[in-house]
């Protein structure tokens, strides 16, 4: 797609935007993301996706629009680049701005809401100019033909370099180190699962289908004293999140994790946690910790990492697991599109194996995401064939899940999914509902649920009005699990 403005025209637009306020999504006031979207809309007539600013490089398909570059110490940002700050900014949501000037040591940007007051009227914080030191947790985005790159910016905290130039000393580049895993062996006490009689033949890697709060420690708290009736619903050998590994079963024990006798008896099951609730960066870190633990165990058992020793849950039974890993590393969503095809299954296994082998060799692998994956959301987007349309023009489909509200009240409607329908009540922050239906109507995505005999309709994000499968959805106003 050709940008609507030339580079010089876009720079002029940035200059004229100074002192103005932008609230493109009409939500949470004048955020930095709104200012990025204002520029993107001027350039392409499109809006960027992502729950927070930090998600922009991963939540959007930049084919034909922008190119991703890895920054190097001698890389110089250009006017018009979009800079994206990581999760260590903006209370975990990151920050985004437009570059108008740069050296190897600092960038000068146009930005909005750097000080965090944009969620209110924020009139004292309109779009303005700021100066930032280069930081390793930044990314920058460049448009094709406009030189607006997505690049990683190195970290520079030496203020002296801003004023005094001097020859660079050649220094040895520090080698990355693997995180130190915190392995907690606390075997479940509600039932003594039988022994295998030998070491495992390999490892089955799972995605837990857990929420943001479903950490390894949370599983430990919920399962370590659970009765047999709960364990029969499923228990893996280890649960991994962050740098924590909770070992729930001894290596010698059979697990109940594949719904298959061979998988349960001969393979060690590891759950990558938070697969329905974590953002992509968090989930990818959980994966890396899992690969590191797999490498440790395989070396302990004297096994190589190959297609026989590294297995997927969907090899043993018809399941979408590992669903999140499938989307991220193959671009195929087994939740909405059906069982993972064999070529995608092998693609995912080979990715796992390559990562694990690197750890076994004492190296630190780099996590990669398929260019076929939007890598933008952990919410399920249904396929077009699942939607139906009623006489009122409402697109609807069956879907059962739990929605947990974010930090703002939402007006619930009765009768139907229209903003003109009677008000039911105010759905409070932190509240949740178990819904059975999803609808597209009146500029919003709605979920339908029944409470105390009354049917309610709750909007949970915006919708651009396009029919499935071409709908464009706004940020989710909470979490789905």
From Swiss-Prot:
Disulfide bond positions: none
Primary enzyme class: hydrolase
Residues the record lists as binding Zn(2+): 206, 313, 321
EC code: 3.4.22.-, 3.5.1.28
SH3b domain segment(s): 398-466
Pfam families: Amidase_2 (PF01510), CHAP (PF05257), SH3_5 (PF08460)
Entries under InterPro entries matching the protein: Amidase/PGRP_sf (IPR036505), Amidase_domain (IPR002502), CHAP_dom (IPR007921), Papain-like_cys_pep_sf (IPR038765), SH3-like_bac-type (IPR003646)
Domain Peptidase C51: residue ranges: 7-142
GO molecular function: metal ion binding; N-acetylmuramoyl-L-alanine amidase activity; peptidase activity
Annotated keywords: Antimicrobial, Bacteriolytic enzyme, Calcium, Cytolysis, Host cell lysis by virus, Hydrolase, Metal-binding, Multifunctional enzyme, Protease, Viral release from host cell, Zinc
Keyword Cytoplasm set for record: no
Cofactor(s) required, per the database record: Zn(2+)
PROSITE patterns named in the record: CHAP, SH3B
Active-site annotation: 32, 95, 111
UniProt remark on cofactor binding: Zn(2+) is required for amidase activity.
pH sensitivity of activity: Optimum pH is 6.4.
Domain N-acetylmuramoyl-L-alanine amidase: 197-323
Similarity annotation: Belongs to the N-acetylmuramoyl-L-alanine amidase 2 family.
Comment on protein domains: Contains a cysteine-histidine dependent amido-hydrolase/peptidase domain (peptidase C51/CHAP domain) at the N-terminus, a central amidase domain and a SH3b cell wall-binding domain at the C-terminus. The CHAP domain is present at the N-terminus and is associated with the endopeptidase activity. The SH3b domain increases the CHAP domain activity.
Protein name, per record: Endolysin LytA
Organism: Staphylococcus phage phi11 (Bacteriophage phi-11)
Lineage: Viruses, Duplodnaviria, Heunggongvirae, Uroviricota, Caudoviricetes
């Amino acid at each position: 797609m050709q940008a609507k403005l030339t580079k010089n025209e876009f720079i002029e637009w940035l200059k004229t935007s100074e002192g103005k306020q932008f609230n493109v999504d009409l939500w949470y006031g004048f955020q930095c993301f709104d200012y990025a979207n204002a520029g993107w809309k001027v350039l392409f007539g499109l809006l960027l996706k992502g729950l927070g600013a930090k998600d922009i490089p991963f939540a959007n398909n930049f084919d034909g629009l922008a190119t991703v570059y890895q920054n190097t110490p001698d890389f110089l940002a250009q006017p018009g680049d979009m800079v994206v700050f990581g999760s260590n900014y903006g209370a975990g949501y990151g920050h985004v701005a437009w570059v108008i000037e740069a050296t190897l040591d600092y960038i000068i940007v146009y930005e909005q809401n750097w000080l965090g007051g944009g969620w209110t009227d924020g009139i004292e914080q309109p779009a303005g100019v700021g100066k930032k030191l280069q930081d390793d947790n930044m990314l920058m985005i460049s448009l094709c033909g406009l030189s607006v790159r997505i690049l990683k910016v190195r970290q520079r905290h030496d203020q002296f370099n801003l004023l005094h130039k001097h020859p660079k000393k050649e220094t040895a580049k520090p080698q990355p180190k693997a995180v130190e895993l915190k392995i907690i062996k606390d075997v479940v006490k509600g039932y003594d699962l039988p022994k295998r009689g030998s070491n495992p033949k390999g490892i089955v890697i799972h995605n837990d289908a857990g929420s943001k709060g479903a950490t390894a420690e949370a599983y430990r708290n919920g399962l370590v004293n659970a009765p047999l009736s709960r364990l029969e619903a499923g228990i893996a050998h280890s649960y991994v999140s962050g740098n924590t590994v909770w070992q729930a079963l001894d290596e010698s024990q059979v697990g109940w994790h594949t719904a298959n006798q061979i998988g349960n008896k001969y393979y060690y099951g590891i759950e990558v946690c938070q697969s329905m609730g974590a953002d992509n960066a968090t989930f990818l870190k959980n994966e890396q910790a899992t690969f590191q633990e797999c490498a440790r165990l395989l070396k302990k058992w004297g096994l190589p990492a190959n297609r026989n020793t590294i297995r997927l849950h969907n090899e043993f039974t018809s399941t979408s697991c590992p669903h999140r890993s499938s989307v991220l590393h193959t671009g195929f969503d087994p939740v909405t599109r059906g069982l993972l095809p064999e070529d995608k299954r092998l693609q995912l296994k080979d990715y796992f194996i390559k990562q694990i082998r690197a750890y076994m060799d004492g190296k630190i692998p780099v996590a990669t995401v398929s260019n076929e994956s939007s890598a933008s959301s952990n919410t399920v987007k249904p396929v077009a064939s699942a939607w139906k349309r009623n006489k009122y023009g409402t697109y609807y489909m069956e879907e059962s899940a739990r929605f947990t509200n974010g930090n703002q009240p939402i007006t619930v409607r009765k009768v139907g999914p229209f903003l003109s329908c009677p008000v039911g009540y105010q759905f409070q922050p932190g509240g949740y509902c178990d819904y059975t239906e999803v609808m597209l109507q009146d500029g919003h995505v709605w979920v339908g649920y029944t409470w105390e005999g009354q049917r309610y309709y709750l909007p949970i994000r915006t919708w651009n009005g396009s029919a499935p499968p071409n709908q464009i959805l706004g940020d989710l106003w909470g979490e789905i699990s």
